[in-house]
């Protein structure tokens, strides 16, 4: 069953415009990350998801959230490589990746069902 799911997922990805960032070699060191910066980035993720990816969504808002989160993802990736691994830093890295996955899924799902409601007609999506 896992094999079938992997084949299905791969066929879906092939036709999309998803361009994952290049994976660079690990260059982490022992500097301790500033937890205030981590908290600020977590707050930015929360605000972005609340304001642009809430219950009522539009293509335009989802694109804006995607762009903001992609930029933050690159910054967090650099931050992750420059500092010692810690639980708050891992939580931040996971949060931005999860937020991006939610945005991508919401953007590609144009059908309004359940608590996913697309209101593209008013904003021109």
What name fits each language-model region?
Residues 1-125:
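Glycine- and aromatic-enriched mobile tails/lids
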